[in-house]
């Protein structure tokens, strides 16, 4: 009887594994189909419209050279040397970023950690001050973290951005719901316990055991200038809406929000910042992104919108 029960559980487990594998494969197939359709649509549109070719000349030229879809058609290739290792006491792989340890989850090998880091630095180009065509870059000359700012990193993942600015910040809130990042995040932040606060919750419009609202979280920072960075898979407009009263009432707020996840995100966020009278800019260059929806014409998307009511001399 026990053997039959065990066999039934094993068969059920195998069935569930097959189901999730097929579901994952189907999802990846749909993404690949959307990417190919987007690439072909851009080629057709560029042949039919000279205005379109001129507006997106940089991106179209690189797509033609590659002969395929790419997330970053604005960017040139870039390489970087990476110092890395494995921490035996923590059992975590790491890379060195500006002399600081940036840890990755235990399921990563050291080689995988290096690949991920190179992706952030060379592929995504998350860091920098907007000097080059890097549509995913969070800061620019006019919208950046200043000494003494309270930084709120919403969707921090490995916390590369926070680690990059932690010396300038007076305090950093790192918000990340995905539990895979908790152990490496705590290791990365260990030298900065006096200024780093990790919040393992989903950002929402209300507070609960699993959610946190930014207005509630930031009540105790009423006198500090804020730099709020968001990369939360298309939920940026929803979260910014919860912030509108705060954005109207307080001085000294700068935001950097991803706009590439969904077709309407850039336009929606632009309208929201216009409502509160913030000056704003989009990052240089465009992205192609087809993970969550089929890109609509003109297909190329702004990567990040930066907005602020701060005036720095």
Model-flagged regions — what are they?
Residues 2-168, 173-175, 178-222, 266-267, ...:
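S-adenosyl-L-methionine
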Residues 223-229:
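Short SAM/SAH-binding signature in class I
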Residues 228, 251-260:
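Conserved beta-strand signature within the Rossmann-like core of class I S-adenosyl-L-methionine
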Residues 164, 168, 184-188, 239-246, ...:
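A short acidic, amphipathic alpha-helical/loop segment
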Residues 155, 229-233:
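Conserved S-adenosyl-L-methionine
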Residues 204, 260-262, 285:
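Active-site beta-loop-alpha junctions enriched in small/polar residues
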């Amino acid at each position: 009887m026990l053997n039959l029960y065990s066999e039934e559980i094993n068969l059920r487990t195998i069935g569930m594994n097959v189901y999730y594998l097929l579901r994952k494969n189907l999802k990846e197939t749909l993404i690949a189909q959307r990417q190919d359709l987007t690439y072909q649509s851009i080629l057709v549109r560029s042949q039919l419209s000279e205005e379109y070719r001129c507006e997106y000349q940089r991106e179209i030229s690189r797509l033609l050279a590659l002969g395929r879809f790419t997330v970053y058609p604005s960017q040139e290739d870039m390489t970087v040397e990476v110092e890395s290792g494995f921490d035996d006491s923590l059992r975590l792989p790491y890379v060195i970023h500006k002399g600081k340890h940036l840890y990755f989850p235990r399921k990563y090998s050291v080689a995988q950690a290096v690949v991920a880091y190179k992706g952030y630095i060379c592929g995504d180009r998350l860091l920098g001050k907007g000097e080059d065509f890097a549509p995913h870059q969070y800061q620019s000359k006019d919208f950046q973290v200043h000494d003494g700012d309270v930084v709120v990193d919403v969707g921090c993942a490995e916390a590369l951005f926070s680690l990059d600015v932690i010396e300038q910040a007076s305090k950093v809130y790192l918000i990340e719901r995905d539990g895979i990042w908790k152990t490496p995040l705590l290791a990365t932040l260990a030298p900065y316990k006096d200024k780093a606060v990790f919040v393992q919750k989903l950002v929402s419009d209300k507070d609960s055991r699993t959610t946190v609202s930014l207005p509630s979280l930031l009540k105790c920072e009423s006198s500090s200038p804020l730099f709020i960075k968001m990369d939360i898979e298309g939920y940026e407009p929803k979260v910014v809406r919860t912030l509108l009263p705060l954005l109207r009432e307080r001085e000294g707020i700068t935001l950097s929000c991803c706009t590439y996840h969904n077709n309407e995100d850039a336009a929606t966020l632009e309208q929201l910042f216009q409502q509160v009278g913030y000056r704003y800019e989009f990052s240089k260059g465009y992205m192609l992104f087809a993970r969550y929806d089929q890109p609509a014409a003109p297909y190329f998307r702004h990567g990040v919108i930066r907005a602020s009511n701060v005036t720095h001399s």
